[in-house]
Amino acid sequence: MTPDELNIILPTLPEKPGCYQYFDEDGKVIYVGKAKNLRRRVSSYFYKEHADRKTRILVRQIRSIKYIVVDSEGDALLLENSLIKEYQPRYNVLLKDGKTYPSIVIKREPFPRIFATRDIKKDGSEYFGPYPGALIAKGMLRLVKEIYPIRTCKLDLREEKIRQGRYRVCLQYHIKKCKGPCIGNQTSNEYESNVSEIRDLLRGNLHRLVRMYRDRMQVYSEGLRFEEAQICKERIELLERYEAKHTVVPRNIDNVDVFSYDEDEHTAYINYMHIEHGGINRVYTLEYRKQIEESKEELLAAAITELRQRFESNAHEIVLPFDTGWQTGESITTTIPRRGDKRKLLELSEKNVAQYKLDKLKRAEKLNPEQRALHIVHGIQKDLHLDRPPKHIECFDNSNIQGTSPVAACVVFKMGKPSKKDYRKFHVKTVEGPNDFASMREIISRHYTRLTEENLPLPDLIVVDGGKGQLSAAYETLDKLGLIGKIPIIGLAERLEEIFFPKDPVPLILDKKSETLKVIQHLRDEAHRFGIGFHRDVRSKKQIQSELDNIKGIGKKTKEDLLRHFKSVKRIRSAEEEELSALIGRNKAKLLYEGLRKK
């Protein structure tokens, strides 16, 4: 829109609550929004600098504006939800259903069937749920079928067809799981009475059913109808056993909606739980694909409206993790609990939404391993407060025994995994005796001097195996090379798995299950393994050299032949003189045999 057009339109917008619609040059709705004050909200799009690229693109595409005034912000929220569903604007959040949770349906038909389904149809049938998983839905159905004999067939049980005698009973009738309404053995009223009780059960109202069966059992017992009293007793036991296993909500919390929120860079996740009759009888997760500068408060408020409408919730209270400003004209209490039973319910919802987000990430990572690697390095960046993701990490470890044969190792991880072709071994050349700090200075200096001189890529992070002393030695060396600020460096102290930063006496302690800590531990362990293996090889080689070199008459070629054949000095020493003679000749064999026996 041109500045002249804006100067005409914006001042005329009302300072009232309502919804606004942005149209592109084709007259298509590209964005719908709600506002407490229409003029202020719409003006902010044109008179404010936007950091978000999508917002800038949206503003450039706006060619006309329409608005609808309503009585309250709550009405604006409801209207916005309807308009987004109607027009599906390109720049609004994209609503995606969470995984399709199962519900239990009571079909609208004569002698209604009751079964689990993921397909909700608007055919007048009643739906209960959705349940958090198929096992829970099946468990509830199993309870229903243990208590009530309901039909499972798909027969058309209209009265005239039953009268015509078209049907025969099935196995369910013979095993007493169905009373045979198909042949007229059960009246519609009797069947509907059972269905009415099943509705109570599916709504979670177990206590009312238990009281009802206790009263019936008393009446049957007094009337000496012991068989019927026994059936009531068995049903009470089934209900109480189910309740003991599944009730996780205090009985004083009834008809309450609980919402929790989580998000990543591109998506918001909202979990919804409905609490009724002391039980959780509905759990659902929505995904909102973020499109344009929505706050978490706006996204959660939109989800509350959407979910309450979808499931026709009349809950008198909603429990939230933070204030959203959500309101309607209804008298609904909003609670943000800090402790107590409602806080526990909110934490349960938060666990569900976090698990949903994690499951989605795991599924995506299975399909795309590179995404998992990227997720890990971004996690390391976040946990260690780095300026860039550490896609290339180098870790150093020294190895010696009382200062003898000092060596060092450098292992390299790329995208969170070992890159063995880039591993490096070092002989420590300038250090006498056991001095790990001096050894670290030498190795860091040699390695990074070579990288800078040869213009090779530097790592995104250096990890030093050791505490503050080793870290300080490496940091001082990097400072002399002018690399401070170019390469971040940390030290890992083994005893408590503390992570130290240069010139900071307070270590960082990560969660033991943290991916970042696991990668750093893997780096440290790999450097340790590689360094010890190299040190063992060096010691072994020196030992071989010292034992065979000191025997006169045994030259380099002879040593090579012996080691190739016997593999070790120990086996050479245990060999008989005749065996040695066959390989290197009688004279050399005698010199070698006697020389090794003297040692």
UniProtKB/Swiss-Prot annotation:
**Domain of life of the organism in this record?**
Bacteria
Gene Ontology biological process terms, A to Z: nucleotide-excision repair; SOS response
Which stretches make up the UVR domain?
207-242
Where is the protein found, in the record's own terms? Cytoplasm
The family database entries (Pfam families) matched by this protein are listed as: GIY-YIG (PF01541), HHH_5 (PF14520), UvrC_RNaseH (PF22920), UvrC_RNaseH_dom (PF08459)
Taxonomy of the source species: Bacteria, Pseudomonadati, Bacteroidota, Bacteroidia, Bacteroidales
The intrachain disulfides are none
Q: Which NCBIfam families match?
A: uvrC
Recorded GO molecular functions are: DNA binding; excinuclease ABC activity
Query: What protein name is recorded for this chain?
Result: UvrABC system protein C
Q: Which GO terms describe its cellular component?
A: cytoplasm; excinuclease repair complex
Transmembrane intervals:
none
Q: Which residues form the GIY-YIG domain?
A: 15-93
- Which InterPro entries does this one have? GIY-YIG_endonuc, GIY-YIG_endonuc_sf, GIY-YIG_UvrC_Cho, RuvA_2-like, UVR_dom_sf, UvrABC_protein_C, UvrC, UvrC_RNase_H_dom
Q: Which organism is it from?
A: Porphyromonas gingivalis (strain ATCC BAA-308 / W83)
Q: What does this protein do?
A: The UvrABC repair system catalyzes the recognition and processing of DNA lesions. UvrC both incises the 5' and 3' sides of the lesion. The N-terminal half is responsible for the 3' incision and the C-terminal half is responsible for the 5' incision.
Q: Which UniProt keywords apply?
A: Cytoplasm, DNA damage, DNA excision, DNA repair, Excision nuclease, SOS response
List the PROSITE patterns.
GIY_YIG, UVRC
**Is this entry keyworded Repeat?**
no
